[in-house]
Design a protein with these regions (language model features):
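Conserved catalytic-core segment of nucleotide-activated headgroup transferases in glycan assembly
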Residues: 22, 207-279, 289-294, 298-299
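Donor nucleotide-sugar binding/catalytic pocket of nucleotide-sugar-dependent glycosyltransferases
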Residues: 134-135, 164-218
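Conserved acidic donor-binding segment of nucleotide-sugar-dependent glycosyltransferases
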Residues: 346-353, 360-361
Length: 361
């Protein structure tokens, strides 16, 4: 079997400055299941250096060819002029072209499958008519902005509404441009696949759950004593800021009843203020902005909290927690597309009050 992957990012074991882990582990699975030869053509937007690229080639036994981004795009990034994308009809990276010499090289291999990773590159399938093409999106970006426009807290200002409406229009325009009935569009989100199909009736959309990868199958599930270790993971950013503020405000209010039973850790950037707040009101709290071995640090805790307000697809940090034996307390968006059951293998909550109630149970 011969497979050619065209990707925005260079595959890596864990996400590195992009959603680069999914293709890595899919390639690894293919290699274990078939006698497969894999060539990767990467725009390397996650900026791996030569040594890192060679290491990935060695780990997966693949060949990686680097592709150039347009010079104007590189200049725009270098001069921090990304805001100029508002003058473009399509999303920024969709302007990455595939030179004819690489098209010819790929065709000469007679690959069984042309695999494209990243929605912005989906239009590259046009170069390989007659070949079996699969595009791993992996999320539907237009659904993300559609969801944003439905959030009251995200649309309080006119500028916000215009920003999300414009991005929605960009991705919808791109989807109309590239969607072909003889190409398979692969998603790791059920609603992503359904929304894409709804908006593009001729689309052949496929939903497959995101694979687990970095996990410890031998971990003994047992809460720490005398204090249960509660973990907030991921960057404190727009995706989770509103929900996390709600959860943590309620936690702060209930300090008298909970500070004796829970130890709090924030693992990720941006949590400094909340760590200081909880520490001042009596919680045992610490902030780890970066862990050299993320999985090892994860396994030191009992419960993982993910208050994600909006998003699409599958949330990698949530998958990591489940795979490593932590009880996940999370919002519906945090837990979507993961094969778990509320009250059995996870606890699903919608707001800060429900979060606190789950800690008292």
């Amino acid at each position: 079997m011969r497979l050619t992957l065209i990707s925005l990012s260079t595959p890596t074991f864990n996400n590195c400055r992009a959603a680069s882990a999914l293709p890595y582990h899919l390639i690894s699975s293919v290699k274990k299941s078939f006698s497969a030869s894999v060539d990767v053509y990467s725009y390397n937007i996650n900026e791996l250096d030569t040594n890192q690229i060679e290491q990935v080639e060695k780990e997966l036994n693949i060949t990686i060819h680097l592709l150039d981004k347009p010079k104007w795009l590189k200049l725009m990034m270098m001069l921090h002029l990304v805001f100029l994308r508002v003058f473009l009809k399509y999303p920024l990276y969709s302007y990455c072209s595939l030179p004819q010499k690489h098209i010819d090289a790929i065709k000469s291999t007679h690959s069984d499958v042309i695999w494209i990773y990243g929605e912005e590159l989906a239009n590259h399938s046009k170069y390989f008519e007659g070949s079996k093409c699969i595009v791993t999106m992996p999320d539907c970006e237009s659904l993300y902005y559609y969801r944003m426009l439905r959030q009251p807290w995200a649309t309080m200002r006119l500028l916000q509404i215009l920003k999300y409406a414009f991005a929605y229009w960009q991705y919808k325009s791109l989807e109309r441009l590239f969607c072909e009935k003889d190409v398979i569009y692969h998603f790791v989100g059920k609603e992503d696949a359904d929304f894409f199909k709804l908006m593009n009736g001729q689309a052949n959309s496929l939903f497959m759950r995101h694979p687990l990868y970095a996990y410890n199958s031998e971990k003994t599930i047992k809460f720490h004593q005398p204090k249960i270790k509660l973990l907030f993971t991921g960057r404190y950013d727009f995706y989770c800021q509103h929900g996390s503020d709600d959860f943590l405000s309620e936690l702060e209010k209930n300090r008298n009843g909970l500070s004796s039973y829970f130890e709090i850790t924030f693992l990720g950037k941006g949590w400094e203020k909340w760590n200081e707040k909880l520490h001042k009101v009596g919680f045992q709290s610490q902030h780890i902005s970066f862990a050299p071995d993320y999985i090892a640090e994860l396994q030191n805790h009992d419960i993982q909290v993910n208050a994600i307000d909006v998003g699409t697809g599958t949330k990698g940090k949530v998958l990591d927690g489940i795979a490593n034996g932590l009880l996940i307390i999370g919002t519906p968006y945090a837990l979507e597309n993961i094969s778990v059951k509320n009250g059995d293998s996870c606890v699903m909550v919608s707001n800060g009050i429900e979060f606190i109630q789950s800690l008292y149970v």
